[in-house]
Amino acid sequence: MGLFKKRKYITVSSKNLDENNDVENQPTIPDGMWIKCSKCGKILYKSDVDDNFKVCPKCNAHLRMNARERIEFIIDEGTFIEFDKNMMAANPLEFPNYEAKIKSMQEKTGLKDGVVTGLGNINGYKTVIAVMDSNFMMGSMGSVVGEKITRAIEEATERKLPVIIFTTSGGARMQEGMFSLMQMAKTSAALAKHNEAGLLYVSVLTDPTTGGVTASFAMLGDIILAEPKTLIGFAGRRVIEQTINQKLPSDFQTSEFLFKHGFIDMIVERKELKVTLGNILRMHS
């Protein structure tokens, strides 16, 4: 019976395995050429997304922009003057590894902390602007973020100019404890004085705007705008559901939900933001 037993063979590929056809000779894809949409999951050319103001061309998801990108998009070219560029956080509570975390974020983002403030023109109208950056410790508000925003508001009050703040934040920065929480009161007090002077404050809510930022300056605007599908809230959805023992609507804490319930004034597509802000400044100039 052994004569009829099926023999075992080793399959040898006929593909040329010559060293000249090594991996180095195969086509390569440059790093950073593709990006995956965080909403629909589609793989997209990064250049197409960048050319579309970082909006997904497939599902219209407004992907996150960093502070420098947003300033370049919103402010007229050559008019931006930055405030307090080199202000850096201390570690007043001696929180373990906080300095190392800050340094790591600075190297990653090119920023000293989570907000960029300054003076510039939007369609020819001068304004003070503050733009938060979620790439820097999720835009958390510590002493530097609060101080820079407060100084920007005070500068606007002194110059009798409007203020525009683009918010994106996970809330207060836990590493700074009470020093972080007091920024809520400080920024709000500065805005109160700005308001008493009869000046305009426009708040633009971008994804995500949560925690202490929502509970302070983000919701104090004379006019409150938001990008589509922006997450806006104070406590997290799961915490609220567990507290009230109820299931929340699927669109809860979205800009659309808040607009429907009167908490924000307008939802604006990103590509229309500069025109919209320019028109608001023109009407109030």
From Swiss-Prot:
Its EC number is 2.1.3.15. It catalyses: N(6)-carboxybiotinyl-L-lysyl-[protein] + acetyl-CoA = N(6)-biotinyl-L-lysyl-[protein] + malonyl-CoA. Keywords: ATP-binding, Cytoplasm, Fatty acid biosynthesis, Fatty acid metabolism, Lipid biosynthesis, Lipid metabolism, Metal-binding, Nucleotide-binding, Transferase, Zinc, Zinc-finger. Pathway: Lipid metabolism; malonyl-CoA biosynthesis; malonyl-CoA from acetyl-CoA: step 1/1. The keyword Lipid biosynthesis applies. One of its GO terms (biological process) is malonyl-CoA biosynthetic process. Signal peptide: none annotated. A zinc finger (C4-type) spans 37-59. It is an enzyme of class 2 (transferase). It is found in: Cytoplasm. One of its GO terms (molecular function) is zinc ion binding. InterPro entries: AcCoA_carboxyl_beta (IPR034733), Acetyl_CoA_COase_Trfase_b_su (IPR000438), ClpP/crotonase-like_dom_sf (IPR029045), COA_CT_N (IPR011762), Znf-ACC (IPR041010). GO terms for cellular component: acetyl-CoA carboxylase complex. Residues 33-285 form the CoA carboxyltransferase N-terminal domain. It holds the Pfam family Carboxyl_trans. It comes from the Bacteria. Zn(2+) binds at residues 37, 40, 56, 59. Its cofactor is Zn(2+). The keyword Hydrolase does not apply. PROSITE patterns: COA_CT_NTER. Binds 1 zinc ion per subunit. Belongs to the AccD/PCCB family. Acetyl-CoA carboxylase is a heterohexamer composed of biotin carboxyl carrier protein (AccB), biotin carboxylase (AccC) and two subunits each of ACCase subunit alpha (AccA) and ACCase subunit beta (AccD). Component of the acetyl coenzyme A carboxylase (ACC) complex. Biotin carboxylase (BC) catalyzes the carboxylation of biotin on its carrier protein (BCCP) and then the CO(2) group is transferred by the transcarboxylase to acetyl-CoA to form malonyl-CoA. This is Acetyl-coenzyme A carboxylase carboxyl transferase subunit beta. It comes from Clostridium acetobutylicum (strain ATCC 824 / DSM 792 / JCM 1419 / IAM 19013 / LMG 5710 / NBRC 13948 / NRRL B-527 / VKM B-1787 / 2291 / W). The gene is accD.
